[in-house]
Amino acid sequence: KNLMNNQNIITRVSNELGNQMFMYASTLGISKKINKTLLIDNETAYLSNKNISKYGLNNFKITSKIAPNNFKFLGTVGYFKRKLIKKMNNLYINKKFYIEKKDKDKITKFDNNITSINFAKNVYFEGYFETEKYFKDINDIVLNEFNFIDQKKFIESPYYSEINNSNSISICLRQDRFTEGKNENDGVINSKKSTTFTKEQIIYINKSINFFKKKFDNPIFFLWS
């Protein structure tokens, strides 16, 4: 199948696995609504020297293809080409980029109008898209996409039966938010910001635990970090 002849969404996945899963599921849902083929850019977000994450969707039985190199903004030329097209995007009648909007606190929200935008034949999607509203219509498809390739290893995990046979609730505690992957010389400010961020998470987590204890019988909490 010649991808050059298709109408494509190229989703630029980034960060850790949870973010990648939302990006993939949401853009898969959008691609089906606007009748485009979804391709995955599994590379350009991970090229920075500051990056400490790695592409992880290859652990799942996802059906979307990896975008070929000519669809990615690789190397120095690709870097500047991406910057230029993004800057000029508002001038295009058919948009070549869709960048998820954030408010001043970097909070995003569901875009009701996304399916009515005029997109170019090949459009690049960048954002976290952290709401199931983008893919709730294809929930069964998404669940199948996220089946593990190595199912045996998954089932043999010591946590599998515990999670599967209880009212399990997973909690992720993000640590070193503003210092991970950075030079120690970046200073005390980032370290303090990380400490504050962790403390705020703990307050939020404790509130969440109390909430779920009222909603479920004997919930079992699994803490990941």
Model-derived segments and spans:
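Short, Lys/Arg-enriched N-terminal segments with co-localized hydrophobic residues
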Residues: 1-3
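A short, glycine/small-residue-rich beta-strand->loop->alpha-helix junction that serves as a flexible
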Residues: 13-22
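Donor-binding and catalytic core of enzymes assembling or modifying cell-surface/extracellular glycoconjugates
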Residues: 17, 206, 210-225
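Short amphipathic alpha-helix
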Residues: 23-30
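A short beta-strand-loop structural module common to alpha/beta enzyme folds
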Residues: 36-47
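Short beta-strand segments
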Residues: 40-42, 172-173, 220-225
